[in-house]
Amino acid sequence: MAVRLPRGFRAGATRAGIKPSGRPDLALLVSGLPAAWAYAATQNRAAAPSIHRGRALYASGKPLRAVVVNAGNANCATGERGYEDDRRMAELAALRLGLSPEEVLTASTGVIGVPLPVEKIAKGLPEIGLTPFAEAFAEAILTTDTRPKVAEAEVAGARIVGLAKGSGMIHPNMATMLAFLVTDALVPQEALRAGWRRVVERTFNQVTVDGDTSTNDLALLMANGAYGEVPLKAFFEGVEAVAQELARMIARDGEGATKLMVVRVVGAATEEEARRAARAIAGSALWKSALYGNDPNWGRILAALGNSGARFDPLRVRIVLQGIPLYEGAVLPFDREEAGQAMRAEEVEVLVDLREGQGAGEAYGCDLTEDYVRINALYTT
């Protein structure tokens, strides 16, 4: 079923010839009204020009009207030309939409170190037809993903729709992929930005596929107010639900992955320590390999936990895998064959109780397979 965008938003895409595969690779997301926006971007020191430009636009505090995305070329590490090409992409999109370049955010994803084919973007932008539906945009922004990622929610009549891409080079650091959430709710910009920071910390920053943070990651929330005001608490609960669903989709679609890993940590001294502990477990290559092999190797979970920086007493901590208690201060008697069978599920849950306080947090990851190595041995980054 087609997902309709919130009131006032339109999107579209085309095949501009940026991807060697010939798949759709150039997309626009447009608001008919000036939108308040909140933005989180990669902290990678080799960030792409699109990130530097996005930060400058964000600091200006001015409304946003559109996003232009190219998938297939990161436009990163190409010297001063990359900055000029990024500005040119914004100018071309603004010309296509009748806007000023300062109202247009750019995003790029794909191969690093290759000059951006601006001439293909110039030719492709006029070919993009805009509709009130999400699917064309969601498809065009993909790179090594195996499926589009779209989620939606409704809060007191206002709609929230999220679109994301991400499969590899995914690791927590202020975004972790490309994600675009749009809503027709009317939300003051200051409240939008504060709430978005909390949502990103709890969702997108809790995804890890391979421990590598991309140079181009961003997570954006646009609110154009076309519907009107809604209760802020309920609104951000809806935003977090959409972001969490997208985060799970990204982890489930990790390069070469066969299963989703959900790590829940409770009883931490603080929420931040719980999130940190969950991320450490979800990101452990040893545990991810054991997960692929259906090996209930709780020692790898405990070792990752010990390296997380979260406070706990190993003699009190409790580890449960797929509902099966494995460890509580010492190994517990359990049926390894039964536990291994339980790990064959498409979604595997690790529950850890640190017994230090009330802090709780989740992280999302996947198993580590031979296919991950194969994909990244063949894909030029």
From Swiss-Prot:
Its UniProt pathway annotation is:
Amino-acid biosynthesis; L-arginine biosynthesis; L-ornithine and N-acetyl-L-glutamate from L-glutamate and N(2)-acetyl-L-ornithine (cyclic): step 1/1; Amino-acid biosynthesis; L-arginine biosynthesis; N(2)-acetyl-L-ornithine from L-glutamate: step 1/4
Q: Which residues form the active site?
A: 176 (nucleophile)
Q: What is its EC number?
A: 2.3.1.35, 2.3.1.1
Q: Which UniProt keywords apply?
A: Acyltransferase, Amino-acid biosynthesis, Arginine biosynthesis, Autocatalytic cleavage, Cytoplasm, Multifunctional enzyme, Transferase
Where on the tree of life does the source sit, at the highest rank? Bacteria
Question: According to UniProt, where does the site described as Cleavage lie?
Answer: 175-176
What's this chain's function? Catalyzes two activities which are involved in the cyclic version of arginine biosynthesis: the synthesis of N-acetylglutamate from glutamate and acetyl-CoA as the acetyl donor, and of ornithine by transacetylation between N(2)-acetylornithine and glutamate.
Q: What is this protein called?
A: Arginine biosynthesis bifunctional protein ArgJ
Gene giving rise to this polypeptide: argJ
